[in-house]
């Protein structure tokens, strides 16, 4: 048996060199106390206990499966972290490159965080300028490896908080039970949330100013999911009522409400039994009614079939022209072969002593509408005012169209077909006429005054706007530049102030609010389709070309006609779906036109690039003359989610407050002025989307403003 001291000496000799060797190759790794998610063994020596010990080794990736994602597409404002966990012997170093150049903290506003012990690069609050190719280079004296990431930063539109639809939801509960209301909030800026309960004070739910009385139940910044839930324990009858989730950030407020109904247990059971009995009765009565209705329909159809086999088809007397089918396309060279189809109206060739023959058009024998019919002989046509896709507009004098003054001539505008019009063009003009008949008089739309449908070509008589369309009205009142000048004697009379521009926006919003109330989608709202009267009243035109949507809330355009691309909402542009919300988007573009005095939207951007930018969330910048409040209104109109855009009613209310608060400031027409890109002229026809604005012209600028002189009213 060996002495104890000899055994211990042998152990020391065996263990000592190995321990000493390990101490040279594995220095202690640095701790990371400020990034818990990185403390997972990704440090330069975090996994050393699981790997064999090498005296010398080139760098290698320790967690390659965590580096599969090469492309990072993140919204602006987020934090981005790139990681290249590696190891080697001796311990390698890591450097970062952006687009081929070494990347340091001073190269970026806001700086960067390089965590060498965790092989990571961290960038907080990324912005579009951070886009690029990021490469990590890991090396020691035995070799080097590299890996690249591609970062794309998507711009976000600043917006008020978005609340998830349907939350909070109406709830019915028993006395003594527990209730939870949920409210999901989406917001880029730090949101604040309050849960409110609506209460009564002195028997009234609203104060003298129309603001409801509420009790604040819960309020906090949203830092956890707990804040988005309202818990009501052991509810009583007094807890019944309306509850509101109110969320706000630096941009604005959003809220949604729900009702809590509290019932005694016996009442709930009774209601369930009563409801079941009612449903049974409804099913019985409905089934019987359907059986009787089906029998009647079968009898009527059989009788109609019998009569149609014995009698020739007679022309139908229908009041609404939209009930008539479209007549087939007519050609001068067509023969009367079996290709013709039966029409529900008498078809004749258009011929009139006061108008040339229209090529390729047959005339519909339209029924007389005594409410709107105007004697053709009392209409004196004048000079042309312009033309559109299928018709032309001429100035005219209508004698006696104002029934209060039967002998007085009123200046009007008359819509008629062009010489090269087709059957479809005639049907479109009739459709526009019928749409306008459905509208009541409104100050901010072009109103129908009369029609001429008998003994000649179709004339649609509408209000006359002396100052033309809004786009040209604004451009004619721009400050002079070397490339864009006008008569200096007109400056004082035509001088615009900031309040005038807001008034233009407000009036158009009022007109669209009315059209929205009549379930009319415009589909082509732009400054070129807003007319200006001699009294500077804004009137929306060409809404008759819109589709009436009584049954559905959207209209899908299926034809491949040319479209006003720059004014179209993304859902209309990419999916061809038109709603009142897509009109709101176009209204935002129109606002931009107004505050740039008729500038062309997205100047210098090709169509293909515009599609890409819209999908990425890019929006036009704020015009110089536009306040932040008005620009945020534009941005709300350009919200990517249609239902998150304001309604025209909300726009009118907001603009009314802005208009009442602002002072009148004139455009400074005496100072040097940068051009608005007058070379970026749009086509005069609303049919064309092939617009020269998509050439690379300079960005339009806006004029300076100065306080209006005293005496301005």
UniProtKB/Swiss-Prot annotation:
Residues recorded with modification Phosphotyrosine: 554-555, 666
Keyword Amino-acid biosynthesis part of the UniProt annotation: no
Region (Disordered): 21-54
CDD domains recorded: IgI_2_FGFR, PTKc_FGFR4
Sorted UniProt keywords: ATP-binding, Cell membrane, Disulfide bond, Endoplasmic reticulum, Endosome, Glycoprotein, Immunoglobulin domain, Kinase, Membrane, Nucleotide-binding, Phosphoprotein, Receptor, Repeat, Signal, Transferase, Transmembrane, Transmembrane helix, Tyrosine-protein kinase, Ubl conjugation
Signal peptide residues on this chain, from the entry's feature table: 1-20
Membrane topology: Single-pass type I membrane protein
Residues that, per the record, bind ATP: 385-393, 415
Segments forming domain Ig-like C2-type: 59-152, 161-261
Disulfide bridges in this chain: 84-136, 183-245
Catalyzed reactions: L-tyrosyl-[protein] + ATP = O-phospho-L-tyrosyl-[protein] + ADP + H(+)
Changes after translation: N-glycosylated. Full maturation of the glycan chains in the Golgi is essential for high affinity interaction with FGF19. Ubiquitinated. Subject to proteasomal degradation when not fully glycosylated.
Active-site residues, as the UniProt record annotates them: 524 (proton acceptor)
Major enzyme class: transferase
Location relative to the cell: Cell membrane; Endosome; Endoplasmic reticulum
Sugar-modified residues: 133, 170, 202, 223, 234
Enzyme nomenclature, EC number: 2.7.10.1
Intervals, Extracellular compartment: 21-281
Transmembrane segments: 282-302
Any GO CC annotation of this UniProt entry: plasma membrane
Extent of Basic and acidic residues compositional bias: 42-54
Chief place of localization: membrane
Family assignment from sequence similarity: Belongs to the protein kinase superfamily. Tyr protein kinase family. Fibroblast growth factor receptor subfamily.
Name the UniProt record assigns to this protein: Fibroblast growth factor receptor 4
Organism: Coturnix coturnix (Common quail)
Chain's gene name: FGFR4
């Amino acid at each position: 048996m060996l002495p104890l001291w000899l055994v211990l000496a042998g152990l020391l000799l065996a263990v000592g060199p190995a321990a000493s060797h390990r101490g040279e190759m594995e220095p202690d790794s640095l701790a990371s106390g400020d990034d818990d998610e990185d403390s997972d063994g990704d440090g330069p020596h975090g996994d050393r206990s699981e790997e064999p010990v090498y005296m010398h080794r080139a760098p290698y990736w320790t967690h390659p499966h965590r580096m599969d994602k090469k492309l990072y597409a993140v919204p602006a404002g987020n934090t981005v972290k790139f990681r290249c966990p590696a190891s080697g012997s001796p311990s390698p170093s890591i450097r970062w490159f952006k687009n081929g150049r070494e990347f340091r903290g001073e190269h970026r506003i806001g700086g960067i965080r390089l965590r060498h012990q965790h092989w990571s690069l961290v960038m907080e609050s990324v912005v579009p300028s951070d886009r690029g190719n990021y490469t990590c280079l890991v090396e020691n004296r035995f070799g080097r490896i590299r890996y690249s990431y591609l970062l794309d930063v998507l711009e976000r539109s600043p917006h008020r908080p978005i609340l998830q639809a349907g939350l909070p939801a109406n709830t019915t509960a028993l006395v003594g039970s527990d209730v939870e209301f949920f409210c999901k909030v989406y917001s880029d800026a730090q949101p604040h949330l309050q849960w409110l309960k609506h209460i009564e004070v002195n028997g009234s739910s609203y104060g003298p100013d129309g603001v409801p009385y509420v009790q604040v139940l819960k309020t906090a910044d949203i830092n956890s999911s707990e804040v988005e839930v309202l818990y009501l324990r052991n509810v009583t009858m007094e807890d019944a009522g309306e509850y509101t989730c109110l969320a706000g950030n630096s941009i604005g407020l959003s809220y949604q409400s729900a009702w809590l109904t509290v019932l005694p247990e016996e009442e709930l059971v009774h209601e369930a039994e009563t409801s079941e009995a009612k449903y049974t009765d409804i099913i019985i009565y409905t089934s019987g009614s359907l059986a009787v209705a089906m029998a009647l329909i079968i009898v009527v159809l059989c009788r109609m079939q019998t009569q149609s086999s014995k009698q020739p088809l007679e022309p139908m007397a229908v009041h609404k022209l939209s009930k008539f089918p479209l007549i087939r396309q007519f050609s001068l060279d067509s023969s009367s072969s079996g290709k013709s189809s039966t029409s529900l109206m008498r078809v004749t060739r258009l011929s009139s002593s006061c108008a040339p023959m229209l090529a390729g058009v047959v005339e519909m024998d339209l029924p007389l509408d005594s409410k709107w019919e105007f004697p053709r002989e009392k209409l004196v046509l004048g000079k042309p005012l312009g033309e559109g896709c299928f018709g032309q507009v001429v100035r005219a004098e209508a004698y006696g169209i104002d029934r209060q003054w039967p002998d007085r001539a009123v200046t009007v505008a008359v819509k008629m077909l062009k010489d090269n019009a087709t059957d479809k063009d005639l049907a479109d003009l009739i459709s526009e006429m019928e749409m306008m008949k459905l509208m009541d008089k409104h100050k901010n739309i072009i109103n129908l005054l009369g029609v001429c449908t008998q003994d000649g070509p179709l004339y649609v008589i509408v209000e006359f706007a002396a100052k033309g369309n809004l786009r040209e009205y604004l451009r004619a009142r721009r400050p002079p530049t070397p490339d864009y000048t006008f008569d200096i004697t007109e400056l004082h009379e035509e001088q615009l102030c900031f309040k005038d521009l807001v008034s233009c926006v407000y009036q158009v919003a009022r007109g669209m609010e009315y059209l929205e109330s009549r379930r009319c989608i415009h589909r082509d709202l732009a400054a070129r389709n807003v007319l200006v009267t001699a009294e500077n009243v804004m009137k929306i035109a060409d809404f008759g070309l819109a589709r009436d949507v009584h049954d559905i809330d959207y209209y899908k355009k299926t034809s491949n006609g040319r479209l006003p691309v720059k004014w179209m909402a993304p859902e209309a542009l990419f999916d061809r779906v038109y709603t009142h919300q897509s009109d709101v988007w176009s209204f935002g573009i129109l606002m931009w036109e107004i505050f740039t005095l008729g500038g062309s939207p997205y100047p210098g951007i090709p169509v293909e690039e515009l599609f890409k930018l819209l999908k990425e969330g890019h929006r036009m910048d704020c015009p110089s003359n536009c306040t932040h409040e008005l620009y945020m209104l534009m941005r709300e109109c350009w919200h990517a989610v249609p239902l998150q855009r304001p309604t025209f009613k909300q726009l009118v209310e907001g603009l009314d407050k802005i208009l009442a608060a602002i002072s009148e400031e004139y455009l400074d027409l005496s100072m040097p002025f940068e051009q608005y890109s007058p070379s970026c002229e749009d086509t005069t026809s609303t049919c064309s989307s092939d617009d020269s604005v998509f050439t690379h012209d300079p960005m339009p600028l806006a004029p300076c403003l100065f306080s209006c002189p005293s005496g301005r009213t």
